[in-house]
Each structure stands twice: as structure tokens, then as C-alpha cells.
Amino acid sequence: EEVQETVNLKYEYSVYR
């Protein structure tokens, strides 16, 4: 799902930061 991918990206970005 595109929505889930976006959430995953945001979560990964937050963890990376």
C-alpha cells in the first residue's frame, strides 16, 4: 500500500535522525 510505504519512510527518517 502506498500509504503504508509513506508511513514506513517517515518512521525510518525519524529513526535515522
Swiss-Prot record:
This is Unknown protein 2. It comes from Lonomia obliqua (Moth).
